[in-house]
Amino acid sequence: MRVTNIYFSKIIKLENRLREFNFRKLPNTENKYHVDVTDDRGQRIMFTMYPDAEHMWHISASEVPQWIYYAQNILGQLIENETSSGVSN
């Protein structure tokens, strides 16, 4: 059995700043992704994203900055685009 590590990075503009989001598919899950990004002070923020039955992506974290919640749909679309293209680093 071969295990494939699926990961990719995307840069998007949020709150007038370019931010690099790193995505990594969690092993042994069908559709969960670990996501991390740095805040304005350089501290890494980590959270998990998963789709619901209607394929809407959600953030699974107790506390993340509001700007990440605002980007939830954008981040979900980035995951969908990347996985549908079949291309990863």
Task: Label each residue range with its predicted role.
Residues 19, 41-44:
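Short, charged low-complexity linear motifs
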Residues 28-39:
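Short, surface-exposed, low-complexity cationic segments
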Residues 5, 43-89:
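Acidic, low-complexity intrinsically disordered segments
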Residues 1-28:
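Negatively charged, low-complexity tracts enriched in Asp/Glu with abundant Ser/Thr
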Residues 23, 35-37, 61:
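Residue-level recognition of conserved beta-strand positions in structured domain cores
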Residues 18, 30, 79-82:
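Generic low-complexity, intrinsically disordered sequence content enriched
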